[in-house]
Design a protein with these regions (language model features):
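Glycosyltransferase catalytic domains, chiefly GT-A lineage
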Residues: 1-119
Length: 119
């Protein structure tokens, strides 16, 4: 199974909607899962609220390992998880983008510089 995941803390909703539209158009084979703050365990959120409440990175990206752990509990062996930050979107089918590279690799990571000058 193919999963496309994204995190929405409410600060980039317009960009996330554009990203999700592009996934629905160009990645029809993906099951889309949108995580948000309510997916962070309450105990963890309370303990690290001083970080998670900071605006940069939705709390300095502290939510990423939490959501990675959650998605890994959902997926099965050989499933594919595709994650993209909200500032990006697809303009064409991206099946070849991952299929070609996944033949010889278990994990793919791309490095992109966000369009936002503050990062």
């Amino acid at each position: 199974m193919l999963f496309f995941i994204v995190y929405n803390d409410g600060s980039h909703t317009e960009q996330i909607l554009k990203l999700l539209e592009s996934v629905k158009e160009y990645g029809k084979e993906f099951e889309i899962i949108v995580f948000n703050r309510s997916d962070i365990d309450n105990e963890y959120y309370i303990r690290y609220n001083y970080i998670l409440s900071l605006p940069r990175g939705g709390g300095y990206w502290l939510w990423k390992p939490i959501l990675i752990n959650k998605i890994l509990k959902i997926v099965n062996e050989n499933d594919i998880i595709f994650y993209l930050d909200s500032q990006y979107y697809f303009t064409e089918n991206f099946t070849n983008l991952y299929q070609e590279y996944m033949q010889n690799n278990d994990i793919l990571i791309w490095k992109n510089k966000p369009n936002c000058p503050v990062y």
